[in-house]
């Protein structure tokens, strides 16, 4: 039986160092998040993923690869996927001459399914297990950090297009992760740089932004909360709030999958209860609030990765001191995100009928 391995960490470059192999072998580390700096070409990425799996086959290899401006791998054959707003625009476009009223919506859902398949199949062909997608935020025209990453303003359209994208991901053998619960689209501040505050009531948020999480709760395999404070619900950001993660997401909306923190190095994750906190305290807060895994980005390039080592040591110490207990259910949810079937290799994928048809459907 595996121990709960909640830490998702990054690596510095195109190949693993000895220190990184040692970190990845630690039983509290459950996965790796990749960035553009880890990319040279497909052959290098595939080799890096094999190196990671050689350390431990159960390590989850993840990436933010949504399409549009958030796509880490863009060259050497990777399809330049459109932003999710393109599918919402397709949905809202007028029917072509002679078409029925629902034709644009059908075209949009088919295109979103195709995008999910292309996205998942290309990543899996290189050894990546999971992309943190789809974005379920609503586009209010307020948030520059969300913007065209969102499908649409209407939660019904967002839900149907996200379900289509997830269907395509599933066809490729990849899971999914809806973000940023309960919604990041209404606030202007960028949580990478500041602490966004959304002053709406719980009722208003549930009726709009959080609605997709309830409608999709049976098919969402993972969720990533927003580093946003909703003071009429809780004084803590959603990712550190048991009110949001347990009472609302799990009990009220019925979500049973994995909960990832958003990046703990973001500015909005470094302030809790009116004071600055370190990575270790933020990680403990996220886990005790109901999170299954905590994501720590871009620390492998800081002082030789010492912030990661300190976080591992602090979490180990917290376990010994009884401040945190591993959760077998969390580990089951992490392992469930690992692909079950073997991936199609790149050359075979490029000539497969399903892949070529999917490419033809993209906007």
Task: Name each region found by the language model.
Residues 31-37, 129-135, 290-294:
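Divalent metal-dependent hydrolysis catalytic cores, especially in the metallo-beta-lactamase
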Residues 37-57, 61, 163-330, 343:
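Second-shell residues forming the walls of enzyme active-site clefts
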Residues 12-25, 112-122, 207-212, 275-285:
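Short, acidic/polar
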Residues 37-38, 80-109, 142-161, 189-207, ...:
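Glycine-rich tight-turn/loop motif centered on a GG-T
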Residues 1-61, 65-80, 363:
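N-terminal hydrophobic targeting/anchoring segments and the immediately downstream early-domain regions
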Residues 53-80, 112-138, 158, 162, ...:
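Glycine-rich, aromatic-flanked loop segments that form ligand/cofactor-binding clefts
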Residues 317-363:
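Extended, intrinsically disordered, low-complexity segments
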Residues 1-5, 66-96, 138-147, 176-197, ...:
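N-terminal small/glycine-rich loop or linker at the start of catalytic domains
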């Amino acid at each position: 039986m595996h121990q709960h391995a909640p830490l998702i960490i990054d690596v510095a470059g195109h190949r693993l160092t000895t220190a990184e192999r040692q970190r990845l072998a630690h039983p509290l580390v459950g996965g790796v998040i990749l960035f553009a700096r880890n990319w040279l070409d497909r052959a290098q990425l595939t080799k890096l993923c094999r190196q990671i799996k050689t350390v431990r086959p159960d390590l989850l290899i993840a990436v933010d690869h949504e399409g549009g401006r958030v796509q880490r791998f863009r060259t050497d054959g990777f399809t330049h996927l459109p932003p999710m707003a393109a599918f919402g625009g397709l949905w809202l476009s007028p029917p072509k001459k002679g078409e029925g009223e629902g034709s644009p919506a059908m075209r949009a859902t088919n295109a979103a399914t195709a995008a999910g398949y292309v996205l998942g199949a290309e990543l899996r062909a290189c050894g990546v297990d999971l992309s943190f997608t789809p974005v379920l935020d609503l586009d209010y025209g307020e948030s520059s950090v969300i913007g065209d990453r969102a499908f649409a303003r209407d939660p019904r359209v967002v839900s149907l297009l996200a379900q289509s994208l997830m269907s395509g991901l599933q066809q490729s053998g990849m899971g999914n992760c809806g973000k940023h619960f309960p919604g990041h689209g209404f606030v202007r501040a960028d949580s990478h740089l500041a602490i966004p505050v959304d002053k709406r009531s719980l009722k208003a948020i549930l009726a709009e932004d959080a609605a997709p999480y309830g409608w999709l709760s049976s098919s969402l395999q993972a969720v990533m909360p927003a580093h946003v404070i909703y003071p009429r619900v809780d004084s803590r950001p959603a990712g550190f709030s048991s009110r949001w993660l347990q009472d609302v997401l799990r009990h009220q909306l019925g979500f049973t999958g994995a909960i990832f923190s958003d990046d703990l190095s973001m500015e909005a994750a470094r302030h809790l209860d009116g004071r600055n906190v370190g990575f270790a305290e933020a990680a403990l807060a996220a886990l005790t609030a109901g999170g299954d895994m905590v994501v720590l980005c871009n620390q492998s390039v800081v002082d030789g990765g010492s912030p990661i080592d300190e976080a591992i040591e602090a979490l180990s110490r917290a376990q010994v001191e009884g401040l945190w207990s591993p959760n077998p259910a969390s580990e089951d949810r992490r392992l469930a995100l690992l692909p079950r079937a073997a991936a199609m290799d790149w050359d075979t994928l490029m000539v497969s009928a399903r892949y070529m048809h999917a490419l033809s459907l993209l906007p």
